[in-house]
Amino acid sequence: MQELRLVLIIVGALAISALLLHGLWTSRKEKPAKFGEKPLGKLDDSNRDTEGFDHTGVGSVRIINNAPEKDVAVHTSQRKEPELHFGEKIHADPLMDSPASVQVIDDMADLPRMSATSEKIEPKFSSDSVVPDPVATAVEEEPVRIAVEQPIQSEPASVVSDYTEVLNTPISDIPEVSEQEVKPEENKVLEPEPVIANVVPEPEPEPEPEPEPVLAPSYIALSVHARNGEMLQGAKLFQCLEQHNLIFGENAVYHRHADLAGTEPVLFSATNMVQPGNFPEDGGYNFETPGVSFYLMLPCYGSAKNNFNLMLQTVQRIADDLNADVLDHERAMVTPNRIAQYREKAKLYSQA
């Protein structure tokens, strides 16, 4: 186990030493030469032709003026803010500008104006060399002359030749062109299309309900008539009428009111069958009559149907008490059909 550890330590030390040696050798091999050790004119001489231009057409850098750098005194004066100058010479700020920039500004002011059509030529340096800070020198760029050939306008020879041939042709040989007769077009009258209006059907007015016919005043009559030619006696007759809630009243006849006290409206009345149809006011113990008639006037107070049923019931009871017969309005024996007709008539007035 210890031998294996010792072997690993030795191998690790050898590997570290090899890496260090390889790094030193690589750094020395790739160490670039200083830019100042070689003259400026000898850079990339192998890539230039006999006239001094490289394969891109860029010539060598020419120094036209190498004025000594002016000493710029640095004062510890108060810092100035940058100002705008229109047409005046720009004064360098010792706090804002460096000596190199001041030299560049002074040299650029003395340079002649360059042509706008000249191309910018940049010097090409090798990638292995370290570029130091450039020296502020003015470089005059030579304008590149470009020969522009003016296009030659060619005359239309074919047009001229055709024009001369037309002029040389005699007039007799020119074919005559007959004018085509232009027939005037007939103005067609456009008939307007019938416009079909969307007729919205008006809603039909609902028929107004017909007013119910006004029933004319009428009556229903029943009579109690004595049998076998006998007469109804006054005292017995009056007592029987009063027992069935009939009250002697207006016009000297008996009335059945809506209430038993006689204060409500009259429902039906009982009169004498003999003219003038009234009863004696003094009691009339000697009074006699062949019969008594009951009348229900239509329209009446309350329900005509109920009033008729009440009158029919009263007439039947009085006829039973007096041993008499019940007659209709024609003085004939009343029948079930006649009673049904009376009820239908009373029903009509009840709905009115």
From Swiss-Prot:
GO cellular component, one term: plasma membrane
Transmembrane segments: 6-26
Location of the region described as Disordered in the Swiss-Prot/TrEMBL record: 35-56
UniProt record, GO biological process: division septum assembly; FtsZ-dependent cytokinesis
Residue ranges annotated as Periplasmic topological domain: 1-5
Parts forming coiled coils: none
Topology in the lipid bilayer: Single-pass type I membrane protein
Biased amino acid composition, Basic and acidic residues: 35-54
Pfam families noted in UniProt: ZipA_C (PF04354)
Cytoplasmic side: 27-352
Top-rank taxon: Bacteria
SUPFAM superfamilies the UniProt entry points to: Cell-division protein ZipA, C-terminal domain (SSF64383)
Places the protein is found: Cell inner membrane
Function per UniProt: Essential cell division protein that stabilizes the FtsZ protofilaments by cross-linking them and that serves as a cytoplasmic membrane anchor for the Z ring. Also required for the recruitment to the septal ring of downstream cell division proteins.
Subunit structure: Interacts with FtsZ via their C-terminal domains.
Family, per entry: Belongs to the ZipA family.
Protein name from the UniProt record: Cell division protein ZipA
